[in-house]
Amino acid sequence: MRKRVFLCILIGWWGMIHAQLLPPIYNYTPSEYKGESQNWKICQAENKKIYFANNTGLLEFNGVVWQRYPLPNGAIARAVSAKGNTLYTGGFAEFGYWQPNKFNELQYTSLSRQLNPADIEDEEIWKIIFSDRWVLFQSLHKIFIYDTQQQRFKIISATHHLPKIFKIGEHIYFQKMKEGLFKLVNGEEVLVTDHPLFREHILINLLPQKEHFLFVTQDKGIYEGTPTQIEAWKVSASQLINTLNIYSCERLSDGSLVLGTIAKGVYRISAKGELLEHLQQKEGLQNNTVLSIFEDKEHNVWLGLDNGISMVNFFSPFRLYKDYEGILGAVYTSIVHQGTLYLGTNQGLFYTPFPLQSNSKFSLVEGTNGQVWQLKVVENTLFCGHNSGTFIIENHQATSICNLLGTWDVKPIAGHSNWLLQGNYEGLHLLEKKDGRWQYRNKIEGFNVSSRFFEFISPTELLVSHEYKGVFRLQLNDDFTKVTQVHKETSAPMGRKSAIAKYRNEIWYFTEKGLFKYNTTTHKFVQDEALTQQLFHQDSYLSGTLVQGKDEGLWAFTQHNIVKIAQGKLDNVPQLKKMPLSASFRKDLVGYENLYEYREGDCLLGTSTGFMSFVFNQVTHTPYEVHIEHIASSRVEGALRAIALDTKEIEFNHTENNFTFSYSVPAYCGMFPSVYQYKLKGLYEHWSDWSEEATVRFENLPAGDYTFLVRAKVGDAVSPNTASFHFVIRKPWYATNVMIAFYIALLCGLLLVVHRVYRVHYKRHKKKVEQEKEKELALMQLENDRTVMQLRNDKLQSEVESKNRELAATTMSIVRKNELLMSIKEALLSSGNGKEVLHIVDDNINSEGDWEHFQEIFNQTDRDFLTRLKNLHPDLTPNDIKLCIYLRLNLSSKEIAPLLNISTQSVEIKRYRLRKKMLLERNQNLTDYILKL
């Protein structure tokens, strides 16, 4: 960031100080512009950037940043000139031109390489001028004329020294030492005059002057006339000019001449030949040797020095005075009275005739050494409020009328023309005029608070403001000897550096809480919201000091502005006019700001280092266009990559998402700082706060569409344009629309697969469930069947048991019957009678009917036995089968015998035979075998 230095002169001794109000001076040191000390030529391109031919090459300044471009051979740049935005430079054995590339950086094209090396050898270019399509490069022995259309050279040589070349209108003039003044006609040199002035003295500049010329020489002063009729320029400054060793000279836009000298700084001479300013190192320049002079488009005058660069704003409405030696001190109050300017400082009261002249001298009013607080004229008498008391100043002499410590202010009392109320460190006091002279009368008892700010509500009622204790309303007795009532005004918020002042018969109170107006009816302070909003809008509170102006205006001081509150022309509503003069430039005495308006709009502002004057109505704010200077991108922790500015839209990889933007406005007057606002659409839509920082960096931007916007403000003038740059950060390949479509398709496919898998799974599950259900049903069915079977078996078992019981009963019946019949038969046999009965008995014993009935029952109970038996033993006889049936019923031989109508022994024999037929082993039981079948 450039360093601004604002300097003024102070030479003298205690009690008398030379006063010279100087224009603002801005100094740039070699360490700031990163070059060497000497600066040989200066120019300005169409884009308003300033360029310097420096020992290290070409310097570029855009109002914010310095950039250095070395010449290809590392030579000193002696000359620079701009045509549009093309810069032509020249140095030792080298000249060519520079043009900005797409990155807004200058690229060099050498023209001297088109020449025969012998033509340029040992030549050093000192000046470059343009004429139609030709560019003329002047060295000390040659002029190289370059045709930009045909790209060809023509060379004019000089036997002797060729110091300068000039363009007057469409004519080209140049000087050859020992030969005279020449003119180019159709590309040929023509001698204009061989006057001794041109043969023997170096011509620094040739300037048109109505129908003749001004000839500025290095060491013979200035002449006027035609080339053939020359005479000295006879003006008031001629004698001074004739003593100067002039190295550079330029005419400014107002017609004045600026002469750069060796060892004596710079002189500004009016068109009439009057000395306007003389600036040298003690006035603030960095060096007294001025190598080059240039007036830019905003009328700032640049000085290329033997050591550094200075910029002087001769046309500024501001003039500065700075007390470097500390003799004058900090200015707390000022006033013009009876043709004299008085300055009250921390070191005394000083005076000088007014208006100020270049040779004005400040003198100390004897006896006023120390802190002066206030200067005020009451009834044409000048009162001086001093740390030592109160003085009346007459004819530059001080007369003490009160020796009480610390007089802040004095005010007239309505209805009492011979009384003045005085505020002191310890309350209020009364001054009285007796026999035409003012004197101290009494202290007003009952109030001992320091009374720096006080205003009358009525002749005996007033308000007193103290920044730490608040605002008090005091009621005085009619004799002004004591305070009868003290009321603390709670409606007035306390605040640092707060103060009250009267404006158009109304009392105003200014604090960091806002601007308040006192209502005499309700005895309340009411905030003026409209004025408070205007005062504090994008501004910072600095001090509540309010100063009465010339036209009943009221001056206030904020962090960034001096504000004038004045009545509206068409209504009674107060209007605010702001002058963007920052506190850092003003060098305010915060809380003790003082501004004296000696004429409407003409102001003198006291500062901590002296004072400044300005014409408020002449302070204008030129709008400047803002430009994006450079754009760089980078990856995380990667190197910066310059971005072309001529690209309407550019896309970046998602990993290249860090961006740095640099911007500027070509405003070089540091009186009003350049501030910037930016926003990045696509990230956020609101503007940033105003800031002097001219670079912004964005890191880790997400993929998206962005537009960077920046605007500037110089003073109160916002740039008419908004510079912009549009760019896109591409999404990573895996987040592109194609990939997103692929992901959607893949997701749909996956969903479809999942759906299908689910359907298959569902079907399988359903089938499994169905199978399990079927199995369960089958099991249930089996269980039911088993139950039914069990029931059926139980029924069958019951039936079998029933049949068995029936069979057993039948068997037993048959057995009993046969036994009975056998008994009967035996009885009959033993009696020998009854053959017929025997026959009946035998028929009943061998009754087939009984057997068939028995067999039917047996088959119902044991259906398969006979089948198995016959299958295993097919050779069994019916009697054998009958025996097997009886054995199946587990009947003994004894029980079987009656059934077969044979003896028990016969049964045993049958059993034996049956065993043999069945091929049973000896140890195998016949009954068990039959039961197991």
Regions found by a protein language model. Name each.
Residues Y332-T333, S798, T867:
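PAS-family sensory domains
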Residues E179, R792-E799, A827-E836:
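Short, compositionally biased low-complexity segments
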Residues F614, S634, V757, K817, ...:
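Phosphate/oxyanion-binding loops and surfaces in catalytic or ligand/nucleic-acid-binding neighborhoods
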